[in-house]
Amino acid sequence: SALFKISPSDTLKIVQELYEKKLVTYPRTDARVLSTAVAKEIGRNISGLKNFQPVAAWAQGAMDSGTYKGIAKTKYVNDKQITDHYAIIPTGQGFGALKSLAPTALKVYEIICRRFLSIFYPAAEYQKVAMTLTKNGEKLFANFKYLISEGYLKVSANSFSKKKDEPKYSQEFIERLANVKKGDKLSVQSIEIKEGETSPPKRYNSGSLILTMENAGQFIEDEDLREQIKGAGIGTSATRDGIITKLEANKYISLNKKTQIVTPTFLGEIIYDIVYYSINGLLRADLTASWEKGLEGVAEGQISKEEYTQKMTTYVTQYTNRVKQIPVSYTHLTLPTKLEV
């Protein structure tokens, strides 16, 4: 969304097209890992990418190094973390269809290929430096890092994106830092004062909102409940974009088509206020986690299906009646004539 300014639903349509043209594997998946069966044949996928010019050299490099042969023993392969389908990867086939792809679709395909090939290259290495300097009783702190080895970063950099510039430091400066010891006296060449202000959190765009929905458990303080919802989140990979689309259709949020920035509408804020002051728990991810825990209890026989259903029915009835009793008056508000459910 941030890179191409397209919505999650448009992204899914593009990846669906790539799938139908046999360029990538099944797109409607939450998985971030591969299956053991796929790992055994992964060399075919890599070898096929030698026919895709933007990543041909990196595919050849992965084949030459042979790192793919041990992929089954890495964190990228885990059958237990796969429910229906493994992660989206390029098939290494279907290149005849590349000519029929729109420019954006071709770029999305390149991203998938580069992300896939990156796992067969070493990690990027940085050197972190933290210094505490003392002068006349005042302490000054300096923290920075510099790149030692690019590793996979040279593979993941897209051909169509501006490369992120890493801070440049002279070799002399780096060598001098390596020799600095506690208690050393350093001469100050210059001092520069910079003034700044803290910035508010950035607004969600459609892409970052999808990721937040996927990782909703991060907002839960209770460790047991946080673990309960881990890997679940709000919705699924096949429904999250639909949830956002429905919120927009109901006029609860506004989605800027050019920037993909998501903004709550006046109606959306009203709905939020009503829920906040009546059923506050619905706004918290730990409620969803507790429901998931209850469902797990049913599955494990710790609680009967009837008992769980009764608890849910009582909860919904109680708080629905509470909402009905709230006196609310908003003027100058035009409500949508039809809400999607």
Annotate the PLM regions.
Residues A2-K13, P27-L333:
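Basic, low-complexity terminal or inter-domain segments flanking catalytic cores
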Residues K21-V24:
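Eukaryotic nuclear/nucleolar intrinsically disordered, charge-dense low-complexity regions
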Residues H332, K338-V341:
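Single conserved hydrophobic/aromatic residue that forms the stacking wall/gate
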